[in-house]
Amino acid sequence: SDVYKRQEEYIDGGWSDNMPLGLAARMGAEELLAVDVDGVGVTLPNLTGLPTTCVRSYWDLGPILRFEPATAKRNIALGYQDCYRAFGRLAGTAYALRAGEDKKLAERFVRPYARLLRSAISRSPSLALTEGAALRPMERWCTTEQARALAPLERAAELAGVDPVGIYTADELCDAFLQKSDGEAAARFYPLLRQEAGWRPMEAAVSAAVPGEFLTALVRFVLTGQ
């Protein structure tokens, strides 16, 4: 990790202290910018008491000592997006969303998704657990209400294989998900989501076995206006 004080550069080799924030504090830093690459070694807790901005990536950056041009290019792009996100210039957790897209996201996804999920759970309560299981990989990352509201769309996009490199508008991320996800596979869960369906124990049991596929169906159902 590189830690900067004024115009001088101090280098720590990692392993025993992957983010040497204490070193920066001892050098006289008054504010810290930390980059956590989730590398091999020990990451000590931040006990400096200094204002700290930490840049982290949701995505697996690959083996830290494997130097491949394609991986390096991808990681540089992700790092650029993560840094902008850390300073509030971009939204999203797994995907980089343009700032100012809140209204569009609420109209196209957040509100209709919440309505659909409430309706489905009222008929089949176990679906709440199924959705929770699908979103579990994002839990520790979603620390704000906005992040939690967007988590189903972002997780579904991840499961569909949408490229995280790139800055998306609300419509672009929704459309990228629709292009990548399997509509035919999602359709088998639609009976659970239709108002007239009633309680469907068989479909609910299947969804519990494949929560990611159920989440994909939920998101597709909303975005295609089924």
Language model: regions and residue ranges:
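Patatin-like phospholipase
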Residues: 1, 5-226
